[in-house]
């Protein structure tokens, strides 16, 4: 029986409607941080069938939060990954406007304190944005809008990615894969030796993030520290969240983190003491803690050449690695896929 041209078109439309595998390309995205969720958004909008894998118990990548446990701040979330974000490119400004409309994010400050050998001064810069309850909440919002459109596996550790004409992620076949996790982690799961070699060229610096709550008022918003071998940045969490809670986060220098990363208790003590010295306070802490980020800041890197069915996204390939760079790189994922 001859179907006829019109009937064939109807059948193709039905196949597309039901997203049969050989009509709709199936793409795996590994990593549900900023760039991974941005890439998943772009791929879904372009009509691809997306499966998103993330190994963490919670999504977010380097958008880490901790919940305080000691009164009077019990239940209060603090950022222990990225502290804030800025927006310079129009595409990202549109996304930020959406977060602002949803009351997920708000403007914080455009001026930080700077301390160096000459004392304390103020430095103006771009507007810093923060998120109510922590930056990770931005990605919770994004994944809530994506969940019904993708297959999503949280707390799932991918063990192997085989890349040939097709891609296999833990033996499951896809047409392409997006590596949206730090290159050292990607290199541990990719089986192809040439791709492993390319990924091994991308390096990251570590950072330790400590924090404390106290009864002492903190008379600053954010502070760049240029005269300490241990501390790089201080953030007043009470200022960020507009609740004036006396909570400070302390971001280490790369060099300090590399030297102290294997003894977190000692590192925390050193960072707390240094912060007290910088702020000229003598605080007894209600609560304190420390977080280790082995893969915190990417060193300057060229994006490695990948097969046409592999994309690698993230802020590692930006001159200014940050949340904006990660989001935009993920949103441009189709430029890497054939």
Label each region the model flagged:
Residues 27-52:
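N-terminal Rossmann-like FAD-binding beta1-loop-alpha1 element of flavoenzymes
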Residues 44-69:
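Glycine-rich FAD pyrophosphate-binding loop
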Residues 58, 66, 73, 80, ...:
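Conserved flavin/dinucleotide-binding core of flavoenzymes
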Residues 60, 73-75, 174-221:
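Central helical "cap/lid" subdomain
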Residues 69-110:
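N-terminal FAD cofactor-binding segment of flavoenzymes
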Residues 84-88, 120-141, 262-267:
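Short beta-strand to alpha-helix junction loop
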Residues 153-166:
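A conserved short coil-to-beta-strand element within the FAD-binding core of flavoproteins
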Residues 211, 216-217, 222-261:
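Active-site substrate-recognition segment that forms the wall
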């Amino acid at each position: 029986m001859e179907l006829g041209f019109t009937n064939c078109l109807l059948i193709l439309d039905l196949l597309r409607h039901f997203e049969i595998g050989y009509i709709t390309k199936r793409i795996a995205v590994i990593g549900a941080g900023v760039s991974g969720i941005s890439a998943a958004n772009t791929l879904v909008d372009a009509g691809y069938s997306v499966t998103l894998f993330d190994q963490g118990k919670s999504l977010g990548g380097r958008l880490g939060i901790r919940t305080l446990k000691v009164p009077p701040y019990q239940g209060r979330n603090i950022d222990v990954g990225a502290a804030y974000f800025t927006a310079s490119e129009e595409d990202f400004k549109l996304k930020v406007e959406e977060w602002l409309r949803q009351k997920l994010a708000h403007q914080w400050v455009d001026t930080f304190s700077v301390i160096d050998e000459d004392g304390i001064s103020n430095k103006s810069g771009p507007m810093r944005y923060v998120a109510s309850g922590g930056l990770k909440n931005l990605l919770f919002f994004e994944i809530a809008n994506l969940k019904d459109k993708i297959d999503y596996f949280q707390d799932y550790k991918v063990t192997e990615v085989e890349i040939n004409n097709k891609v296999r992620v833990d033996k499951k076949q896809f047409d392409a894969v997006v590596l949206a996790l730090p290159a050292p982690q990607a290199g541990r799961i990719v089986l192809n030796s040439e791709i492993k070699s390319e990924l091994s060229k991308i390096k990251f610096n570590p950072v330790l993030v400590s924090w404390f709550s106290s009864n002492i008022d903190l008379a600053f918003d954010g502070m760049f520290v240029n005269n300490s071998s241990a501390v790089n940045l201080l953030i007043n969490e009470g200022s960020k969240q507009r609740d004036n809670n006396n909570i400070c986060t302390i971001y280490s220098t790369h060099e300090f983190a590399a030297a102290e990363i294997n003894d977190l208790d000692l590192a925390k003590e050193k960072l707390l003491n240094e912060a007290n010295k910088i702020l000229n306070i003598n605080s007894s802490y209600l609560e304190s803690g420390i977080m280790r980020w082995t893969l915190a800041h990417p060193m300057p890197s060229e994006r490695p050449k990948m097969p046409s069915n592999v994309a690698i996204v993230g802020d590692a390939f930006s001159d200014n690695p940050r949340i904006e760079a990660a989001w935009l790189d993920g949103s441009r994922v189709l430029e890497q896929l054939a």
